[in-house]
Amino acid sequence: MPHASLPTENVLQGRTFDAVLFDMDGTLIDSTPAVDRSWAAWAREWGVAKDDTAHGRPARDIIEELVPADRVDEAIARVLALETADTDDIIVLPGAAALMTSLPEARRAIVTSCARPLAEARLAASAFPAPAVIVTIDDTPNGKPEPDPFLEGAARLGVDPSRCLVIEDAPAGLQAGRAAGCTTIAVTGTYPAAELDADLVVPGLDSLRIEVTPDGLIVHVESPKS
């Protein structure tokens, strides 16, 4: 069960953090239409059933369940080509750009299950103000739900993972954040609150404000701006 439902109470009140590690798809940007088109096209080409429950997992993990082992690399390359070519309809989610740019460069990173070319294509297509540190599936031996991606993000910022906030929209990412020893915030939209096991669950990033203080980052939960 989630530790907190959609909040009126900020369960993180009184705590400070050193950095924020953001998931990308479904958290900062909405690429769902493009993802659905690309994976549907791939599934038709390869004669497999499209998995609608795979959000937040690396493409390799999904594909390994669907195609013979000797064709996995070929299948991954094809999915990546389809996804990188289709960046239409990708939008920045409410509050995401403002929250990202409110943080100092040394205290923010994106940690995504995308390959780097795909992450860069989607960020460029949406004109999102990307941070300097972006960890992709290409940078770690294991992807979400293993802790490796968030451990790598913390290491690149020079921060103890236990002092990091992870902001995610998917169960696999939240599991990875917890396994890395981070505090987790979930945003609803991709999944309902009941499926998000996090320290705090909010309806969107426009419900959050992060104050930068000499002692660290302080999380404030606010009503979304209309």
Where are the model-predicted features located?
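Asp-based, Mg2+/Mn2+-dependent phosphohydrolase catalytic module
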Residues: 1-18, 101, 107, 116-226
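N-terminal helical cap/lid subdomain that shapes the substrate entry/recognition surface
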Residues: 3-8, 13-107, 115-117, 128
